[in-house]
């Protein structure tokens, strides 16, 4: 049996969501140590995927994954398929963990191992079809740490849309500008009792809100480079927190946050009152991440006020996924 343990990512923000610049997309995010996504794989004659998570893939999403794997098996002439089990855990789909990329890449890597193929990171990324919009999750899977990418050159070949839109398009991958090992800081994550957005709703959001203005992108970029990345490199916790908070009110992130209205604002208020120094929303949410001086106490207070939420302490992760083969 083959086992892969992957670490989720927090996606701080997309960046170049304008259509009149040198590049498209780009983003910044980091890997966290827990909760982990644990998957097991066995060789099989046919592809099968069993999702044991309480909030996992829809039947349509499971079917899409199986068809993607079957297409690769046929194209690459693999002799062995696989039976994949996504184990129980707190990694939900479509809340901001980057679970889709983790699952697709884990399945591709398992296929390569079970078929005794030599491979590298780029092979797994290319076959997964992920990373068409953001290079965060596809790279933290292998590297951990913080990733800052500048998207792809704007040559009119793509529009602005979520990564799932580009899965059949083997195009250029985002350019990684910075890979950074992170300090030993704790943080908390909170998944409020808010219904997450579906892939169709995510596509509709991009269609409605893209492009944004170049000057709005510049505001995001200032916080990303001069604020968040620089503060992490210098381990300046106060500036990091200030920049995370400021970023929430830049154009793109504020549009994402508006999807959840007052419910998100109320959850964030509870987190701040519990002691958080800064609060951000990962990707399209509704997962909120937060930093502070005493994460344990903050988590306990949040659970008392919002008992229906999922809230836990974690930390930055600088490690790759783990692969074990019996």
Residue ranges of predicted features:
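Conserved PLP-binding catalytic core of the aspartate aminotransferase-like
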Residues: 286-288
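ATP-binding N-lobe of GHMP and related small-molecule kinases
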Residues: 1-95, 109-122, 132, 317-319, ...
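Glycine/serine-rich anion-binding loops at beta->alpha junctions
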Residues: 88-113, 132-141, 279-284
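Short Pro/Gly-enriched coil loops immediately N-terminal to beta-strands
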Residues: 32-34, 100, 182-186
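ATP-dependent small-molecule kinase catalytic core of the GHMP/sugar-kinase superfamily
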Residues: 2-5, 13, 19-27, 120-277, ...
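Conserved strand-to-helix beginnings and helix N-cap segments that scaffold or border functional pockets
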Residues: 62, 98-101, 292-295
């Amino acid at each position: 049996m083959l086992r892969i343990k992957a670490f989720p990512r927090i996606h701080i923000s997309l960046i170049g969501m304008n259509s009149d610049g040198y590049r498209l997309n780009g983003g910044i995010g980091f890997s966290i140590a827990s909760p982990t996504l644990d998957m097991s794989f066995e060789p099989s004659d046919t592809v099968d995927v069993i999702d044991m998570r309480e909030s996992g893939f829809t039947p349509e999403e499971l079917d899409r994954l199986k068809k993607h794997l079957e297409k690769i098996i046929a194209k690459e002439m693999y002799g062995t398929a696989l039976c994949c089990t996504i184990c129980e855990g707190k990694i939900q789909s479509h809340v901001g963990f980057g679970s889709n990329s983790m699952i697709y890449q884990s399945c591709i890597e398992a296929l390569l191992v079970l078929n005794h193929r030599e491979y590298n990171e780029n092979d797994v990324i290319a076959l997964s079809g992920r990373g068409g919009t953001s290079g965060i999750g596809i790279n933290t899977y292998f590297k951990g740490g913080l990733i800052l990418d500048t998207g792809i050159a704007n040559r009119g070949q793509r529009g602005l849309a979520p990564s799932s839109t580009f899965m059949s398009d083997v195009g250029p991958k985002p350019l990684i500008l910075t890979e950074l090992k992170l300090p030993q800081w704790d943080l908390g994550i909170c998944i409020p009792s808010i219904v997450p957005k579906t892939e169709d709703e995510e596509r509709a959001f991009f269609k409605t809100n893209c492009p944004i203005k170049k000057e709005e992108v510049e505001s995001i970029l200032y916080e990303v480079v001069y604020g968040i990345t620089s503060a992490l490199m210098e381990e300046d916790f106060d500036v990091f927190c200030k920049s995370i908070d400021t970023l929430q009110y830049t154009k793109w992130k504020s549009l994402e946050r508006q999807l959840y209205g007052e419910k998100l604002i109320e959850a964030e208020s509870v987190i701040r009152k519990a002691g958080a120094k800064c609060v951000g929303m990962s990707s399209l949410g509704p997962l909120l991440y937060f930093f502070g001086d005493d994460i344990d106490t903050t988590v306990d207070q949040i659970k008392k006020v919002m008992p229906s939420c999922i809230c836990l302490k974690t930390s930055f992760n600088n490690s790759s996924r783990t692969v074990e083969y019996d």
